[in-house]
C-alpha cells in the first residue's frame, strides 16, 4: 500500500574503547538485539578502530541496512565511532549504555561520559547524528529509543530520496503558496516543475487506456453505490493513471515522489472534472498531491506520511467556529475555549478513510458559482470528495521556506472534534490548546501560508526530531500561557 515510503532496515553496531572490556560492549549489544525481538540487524563487528569501522560499515551495507544505531557499550572510540556516519549513507542514532548490569569494577563502561566526546567529535567533523532526548539506558530503554527512531529514519531517508513533481504555476493572487526552491535543495529534495499544459497533453494521451475499467471498478468499490457520479469515473480513472505513469516515468534517480498540482481556475473546464477525489486516492497510498501547487505543503504531507505510515491531508486553516455552534455543541462537553477551535477545510482532497461514513463525491460549490452558469446543474466542477472529517487525534504542522529563503516549521497537537460542521467540502472542527495565541504569534507573525498538513495522530515528538535533524532552526509550537511568545503583548 505504501510503496512510495521507505522501508527501514536498521543495523546495530557496538563500539568499544580499547582500554575497556570489549566483551562488555558486545554483551550489551546482544541484550539490545534481544529486547528488539528481531527488529534490528546485529552487526558482528565491534568497532575499536578505523579499520573495524570500515569492516562494520561494509557488513551492514551487505546486510541491506539503510539506518544505523551506533551503540556505546562503554566509553567508545570517539574518532571511529563518529566516522561511521561519514562512511554510511543513511541516518545514524547514537545511544549509550547505562550501568547496572554488572559490578562497577570490570563491569563499568563509562558510556555516559563517552557520549559527550561522541557529540563533540560529531560537531568538529560537521557530521549529523540523531541523539535522543536522553540517550543513555538499559537494553529495554534503548529498544524504546529504537522504536521512535524507525519512523524518524523513515522520514529522513524519504526526504533525501524525494522528487516533488509540480504542474503549475500557482493560481493568480495565491502568493501564499510561494515556494523558494533553495530550501528544497538544502534539504536534499529534487523538484521537477512542469506546466498545466504538459499535464493536459499527457492526460489526453491516456484516453482509452486499457487499465481504465479496473480503476473505475476500484473507485466504485471504495465509494459504494450512490456515492459517486457514474459518468465521471472514466475521466477520473484516466487522470489517476496519468499521474501514476508520470511519477514512474519522471522520478529519475529518485525513489519517491510527491505532487503539487494546479487545480483551478482552468483545470476543471479543460479536464472535465475537479481532481480532488483522485488526489485523495493517491494520498491514501502515500503519494501526496498538494492543491494549488503548494510545494512545501506536498513536502510536509510526505514527511507526515513517512512518520505516521498512514494517510495524511492538506487543509486550509479556514474559518472560525460560529459562537452559536460552540455554545451548543462544544462548550461544557470539551475542555476548549472558542479561540482554541477553527475549521480545517479543503474542497475534497482528504482520503475517504479519514472522513465520516456519509462521504461522497460531490461538486465544488465555489467553482460552480464562478465557472458555470447560474442555476445550472454542476458539470465539470464535479469531482470533490466531501464529508466531515472523522473524529481523531491530529498533529497540525508545516515545513516552509520563507520569502527570505529561511527554513521554518511549526507543530501543534490537538484533535478533530466529533461535532457536525453543517458546511461543505472536506471539513472538520479542529481543537488545539491555545490555538488563538498560536494563530496570532506563529501563523500570522511568521507569515505562514494558509495551508497546513494534518497527520492523524499525535506525532509532534517525532516531527520535532525530524525537523531538527534536517537543520530547521525555527520549530514553533503552541506554547502554553505560562510561556509567552516573544511578540506577545504582556498588557493585552
Roles of regions detected by a PLM:
Residues 3, 8-10, 38-40, 100-228, ...:
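Cap/lid and interdomain-hinge subdomains that line or gate substrate/regulatory clefts
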Residues 216, 221-307:
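Long, internal scaffold/assembly segments composed of regular secondary structure
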Residues 365-492:
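Extended hydrophobic packing segments that form well-structured cores
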Residues 65-74, 93-95, 256-261:
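Periplasmic-binding protein-like
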Residues 83-110, 117-123, 128, 280-293:
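Short, acidic/small-residue loops that bind anionic groups at enzyme active sites
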Residues 53-65, 84, 242-252:
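Short, well-structured alpha-helical segments in soluble
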Residues 283-421:
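C-terminal catalytic subdomain
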Residues 1-36:
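N-terminal basic/disordered segments at the start of proteins
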